[in-house]
Amino acid sequence: MKDSIKAKLQSLIERHEEVSALLSEAGIISDQNKFRDLSKEYSHLEPIVKAFKEYTQALEDKQAAYEMLNEKDAELVEMAKEELKLANEAIEKLESELQIFLLPRDPNDDANVFLEIRAGTGGDEASIFSGDLFKMYSKYAEQRGWKIEVISASEGEHGGYKEIISRIYGDGVYSQLKFESGAHRVQRVPATESQGRIHTSACTVAVMPEADEVEGIDINPADIKVDTFRASGAGGQHVNKTDSAIRITHIPTGVVVECQDQRSQHKNRAAAMSMLKSKLLQAEIDKQQKEQSDTRKSLVGSGDRSERIRTYNYPQGRVTDHRINLTLYKLDEVMEGSLDSIIQPLILEHQADLLATMSDE
């Protein structure tokens, strides 16, 4: 392991001890925000410290085993060889883990998200598939213990949605869903197809981290135009009686957001403002990623909504993620929310990309 990496790890261990001491101070305990932030930092540092201690122990075990090789007893020498092998394997594994821990951390990884699914080419079939995607993400969220709420929905004429926007909140939502942005293509025989022909249609998915005050997304009230209108569709009878739905236009950028699924105009406005901040934050993230891609090409993290990232082929029961050439023949499981078999390889690919960048620097 490089001395620079060891030095960085040592500084993190010292910070872990410092944070641990701070968390027991009365002034910190009484300040909810500081206590929450330090608790989050402590939980982030804890596995790093644990892995580094195991790494240090493995180095000591290796040295002890190496010294045992000089013993005259043949049985002890064989034991030393086995212990040396195990120590080397542990060192290699822990070095990889520690390098990943040191990768630049996405500041939005802990954020909740807005999930936007829009029907693209394919007419009614695209709307139906957008409904299927929403169910898939809803089931995945349920499996991970997250909560999901619909912010706005425009239903398709024959089922599904022309567009549906939801908020997903829980632990580490953005870290798991951020690579889902892009064009999702489906190949299947529609229920209305009498000739049994396979149709291709597509939906676009956008995953945006929910912006809060710490993101520094400030909106000048003079830069927005707020309209109220009568809600329609999901939301029940109550919303049809009042002009409770909200549409906010951000004049400088032309970004428009709507919210109609909350029970009051006040709640709809708050949800719409939160979504507007997230869209402006996402625009800034997209800009930064574009600047980075000018110097290096990332297979996974471009987040370009127009980029075709995945194909769902129903006749073959196949799902293919085109960014990492991953093909799985378990479409039914994926559509039931078993997404980790796709998401985790994407995360590993992204980490490998970052590690390669670190090696080049």
UniProtKB/Swiss-Prot annotation:
Pfam families per the UniProt record, alphabetical:
PCRF, RF-1
N5-methylglutamine: residues carrying this PTM: 237
Q: Transcription regulation: is it a keyword of this entry?
A: no
Q: Which SUPFAM superfamilies does the record associate with it?
A: Release factor
Lineage top rank: taxon: Bacteria
Signal peptide residues on this chain, from the entry's feature table: none
> Which SMART domains does this one have?
PCRF
Its annotated compartments are: Cytoplasm
Q: Name one GO cellular component term.
A: cytoplasm
Q: What does this protein do?
A: Peptide chain release factor 1 directs the termination of translation in response to the peptide chain termination codons UAG and UAA.
Q: Which family does it belong to?
A: Belongs to the prokaryotic/mitochondrial release factor family.
Which protein are we looking at? Peptide chain release factor 1
Species this chain originates from: Francisella tularensis subsp. mediasiatica (strain FSC147)
